[in-house]
Swiss-Prot record:
Keywords: Ribonucleoprotein, Ribosomal protein, RNA-binding, rRNA-binding. GO terms for cellular component: cytosolic small ribosomal subunit. It comes from Hyperthermus butylicus (strain DSM 5456 / JCM 9403 / PLM1-5). It comes from the Archaea. Part of the 30S ribosomal subunit. GO terms for biological process: translation. This is Small ribosomal subunit protein uS3.
Length: 247
């Protein structure tokens, strides 16, 4: 059992180291994550990014360099690398954090960058977004700027399956700035409540009313049929029986 635990711990550590290496090297390419799959004949490495061409390189030169690094420095056997584009980069916290880092390196104003990115994430369909930029923003004293739009979950069960979080650091002349991005992806939380529109309520009432009228009509028809059967099967009175005997 101990050997099995060590195996999985070592495997997770290698994947974490590779993930950190790729995030540091390819943040300008909008690096979003990596998936490592072991096969009997080698290892398949799937890299997700906003701009795959920057990772592939000219004529696949960067891919060949990565394969050699994965094999010699991280111990992956026969790595086969595939680079895929992120389906919706505006809803990926890592991609958004890398965009903010690149814009800050170019000298953009941090508050404007945070507001523009928050608006862009909400336009992509997110329920909420929170962006925190901390460090020496304007003065020698460190402070932070927080931009929060929509509904953001920080605790609870919703965080596990709805919130995507990423942290990135960028080095500027004043010092190191920290970037934290939290995106609440479009999904229905457990406490979701939707108030129906008046038209929907009216339509629902009409539907219930028609169903009640049909049920009442069916009950009335069944009662009439049952009453007719009772009248047809009524027993003869004593006078009727005496008349039948005399006849």
């Amino acid at each position: 059992m101990v050997l099995i635990k060590r195996y999985f711990i070592k495997k997770a550590m290698v994947q974490t180291q590779i993930d950190e290496y790729l995030a540091k090297r390819f943040y300008r390419a909008g690096y979003a994550g990596v998936q490592i799959i072991q096969f009997p004949l080698g290892t398949r490495v799937i890299i997700y990014a906003e701009r795959p061409a920057m990772i592939i390189g000219r004529r696949g030169e960067t891919i060949r360099q990565l394969a050699a690094i994965f094999e010699h420095e991280f111990g992956l056997s026969n790595p086969q690398i595939t680079v895929r584009r992120v389906e919706n980069p505006d809803l990926n916290a890592r991609v958004v954090a890398s965009r903010i880092a690149v814009l800050l390196e170019r000298g953009a104003y941090y508050r404007r960058v945070a507001n523009v990115m928050a608006r862009r994430v909400l336009n992509a369909g997110a329920i909420g977004v929170q962006i925190v930029i901390s460090g020496k923003l304007r003065t020698e004293r460190a402070r932070y700027e927080k931009v929060r739009r929509g509904k953001v979950y920080t605790t609870g069960h919703q965080v596990e399956y709805m919130v995507d979080r990423a942290v990135m650091h960028v080095t500027l002349k004043p010092g190191v700035l920290g970037i934290e991005v939290m995106i609440v992806k479009p999904a229905k939380p457990s406490d979701y409540v939707r108030i129906k529109q008046p038209e929907e309520v009216k339509e629902f009432i009409e539907q219930v009313r028609s169903e009640l009228e049909k049920a009442r009509a069916a009950e009335a028809a069944a009662a009439v049929a049952q009453q007719g059967e009772v009248v047809g099967e009524a027993p003869n009175t004593p006078l009727e029986e005496q008349g039948q005997k005399q006849g």
